[in-house]
Amino acid sequence: MSGKAHKTTQNSALQGISEQENFMIRVLFICHGNICRSPMAEYVMKDLVKKSNLSDQFHISSAATSTEEIGNPVHRGTRAKLAQAGIACEGHHARQMTRADYDGYDYLIGMDEWNIRNIKRITGGDPEGKIFKMMSFAGSSRDVADPWYTGDFEATWKDVTEGCQGLLQYILEENGKASKK
């Protein structure tokens, strides 16, 4: 595997990561609370990767920049949108990202500008160019719509699916793999 895919077997501070997963392309989606946008992106991306027969080549997760929702499940609005698409999200509990996540992931994807600033604060910067804003993969500089304030999970779904599709294409191209659409 070429490109940004993890090739090291060094032990990171991340829990639950096996040796095999260290050879995967590792993506972490990040929002403020890890109950609405970032878990939606996590499960949409897992679904896209599965449908592309690439599940064995990816490790996908999500986290928060804040401590406000730690331990809480996916928001009911996000669960409902995922369920409408036949995507399960059981077992997810919000967690806060750590500095170690920077070393453990190839792509850290923030949902908005505020998230990006907080991610860089937590990680101490972005010397390896791993931090991206989600909508940049959909050809936009805007933020992913935040349903926490609007209640509009449909707008968030549209942003997340466009962003995830663009991100998957970007990753496949960067790692020298042909898209399996």
Go through the PLM ranges and name each one.
Residues 31, 82, 109-110, 160:
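Hydrophobic structural packing positions in well-ordered secondary structure
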Residues 107, 113-181:
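Phosphate-binding/catalytic loops
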Residues 3, 17-104, 169-181:
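Conserved active-site segments centered on acidic
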